[in-house]
C-alpha cells in the first residue's frame, strides 16, 4: 500500500514535469537557485518541500530525483 502511494505520487510528479516541459506554468521552474514549496525542476540549488528534479543540491521534504546530493529534511 505504501509502495502504491509512492508510485502514484511519482506518476503525478512526472505528469507535472511533462506539463512544465510543454510550456505550462509551474512553481519554481528553471535552473539556478529555487527556494520554496511546490515543484522545482532544473540544475543548481533547490530548497523547499515538494518535488525536485535535476542535478545539483536538493534540500527539503518530498521527492528528490537527480544526480549529486539529495535528502529529506
Swiss-Prot record:
Signal peptide per UniProt: 1-19
Disulfide bonds: none
Arginine amide, modified sites: 72
Keywords associated with the record: Amidation, Antibiotic, Antimicrobial, Repeat, Signal
One GO term (biological process): defense response to Gram-positive bacterium
Record carries keyword Calcium: no
Sequence repeats: 32-37, 38-43, 44-49, 50-55, 56-61, 62-67
Free-text tissue specificity from the UniProt record: Expressed in hemocytes and at very low levels in ovary. Not expressed in adipose tissue, brain, caecum, gut, heart and nervous chain.
Function noted in UniProt: Has antibacterial activity against the Gram-positive bacterium B.megaterium LM101.
Protein name: Armadillidin
Organism of origin: Armadillidium vulgare
Amino acid at each position: 500500500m505504501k509502495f502504491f502511494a509512492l508510485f502514484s505520487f511519482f506518476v503525478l510528479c512526472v505528469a507535472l514535469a511533462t506539463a512544465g516541459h510543454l510550456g505550462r506554468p509551474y512553481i519554481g521552474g528553471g535552473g539556478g537557485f529555487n527556494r520554496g514549496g511546490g515543484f522545482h525542476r532544473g540544475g543548481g540549488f533547490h530548497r523547499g518541500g515538494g518535488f525536485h528534479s535535476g542535478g545539483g543540491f536538493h534540500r527539503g521534504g518530498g521527492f528528490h530525483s537527480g544526480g549529486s546530493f539529495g535528502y529529506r529534511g
